[in-house]
Every structure is written in C-alpha cells, then in structure tokens.
Amino acid sequence: ALRAGGRRAVGMKPVASGCTLGVDGWRNDDALVLQAASLPTPAYAQVKPYPFPAATAPQIAAAQVGVRVQMAPMQAAFEALAASADVVVVEGVGGWMAPLADGFEQAQLARALQLPVLLVVGLKLGCLNHARLSERAILDDGLQLAGWIGNQLVPQLDYGSEYFELLQRSLRSPCLGLLPHGD
C-alpha cells in the first residue's frame, strides 16, 4: 500500500526463524517476500540481520546456535534501510510478548527504532483474547499503537465476520483494514 502511494518502502524482519540453508546462506521465506516487495531492493542481510534454522521462538532458536540477539546489528540494519527509503516496515518476531533474548523485549526494539506498532490479528479461535491482551501490553509498554489489521488466515472461518466485528467494538485502537486470505 505504501509503494502504491508512491512511497519508497522497504521491509525488515530482524529475527527470522525457520530458515533454510542455501548457496547464499540462511534464507527465510517471509524475509524473501519482504525483500522482493521492497523498493529500493535492499541487501538480504539488512532485511534479516538474525537468521536461525529452528522454527521456534526467537530466544530458543538463537540459543540453539549459540547466539544472543542484540540491538546493535538490528539498529545498524534499520538505519541502513532508512537511509535508502521513505518508510521501513519492521515485522514483529514471534508475538509482542516473545522475548528476543534474556532482558531484551520487543518493546525495547520498537522504542529504540522509534516505531509505532501495528497489531496484526490472525482471525481464528482465540483471536479476541490474543488481540485484547496484545493491545493492552503494547499500550502498557508506553508505545504508540497505530492500529490493527485483521488477517484472514483461512478462506472460510466459522464466525470469522463475528470475530472481526467484535474486535472492532472491543479494541481501543483503530481498525486499519482486513487482509483477505492469500494476500
């Protein structure tokens, strides 16, 4: 949407788990999609400073390969991306309350990069609780919550429209849209 509006926008996934090893190193499908959707096209290492093979929580994936996720590499990658684009969209890692390392939370990353937060809510059973708790945690962390987007995870969900309507009524932040399944 940013690019369609004429903005130079790039994506970043600071920590990527579930990577596969190829001739060019560790690669993650989500990070590759972000790289392909970015304009200008950034270096892959800037899109994804921390690649991990295990498809699990970032702190666990990092520990399995003896790495401690730290702010400096992510800050440097973000600054390089920001120097070449109007907007850098940073994808979250494992959910708002998933720690990046001992004593290093998602909120610290968002605060250091001076980013507003956009909550993406996967529409499924349990999404009402998840979204309300996440919104509360983001606001309690003192961050700007720009709004939320509903994400249709499956083509047909029993009570999907009811979930979406209830989210619109119960969340304090504005709904910025609904992503149809497959987009």
Where are these regions (language model features)?
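N-terminal phosphate/diphosphate-binding loop that engages ATP/GTP or pyrophosphate donors
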Residues: 1-68, 72, 77-80
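Conserved catalytic-core segment of NTP-binding enzymes
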Residues: 4, 80, 87, 92-178
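Active-site donor-binding loop signature of nucleotide-sugar glycosyltransferases
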Residues: 14, 180-181
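Surface-exposed, flexible loop/turn segments at secondary-structure boundaries
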Residues: 17-20, 125, 156, 183
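A short acidic, often aromatic-flanked loop/helix-cap motif at beta-alpha or helix-coil junctions
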Residues: 53, 181-183
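Short, surface-exposed amphipathic charged segments that create phosphate/polyanion-binding patches used
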Residues: 62, 162-163, 183
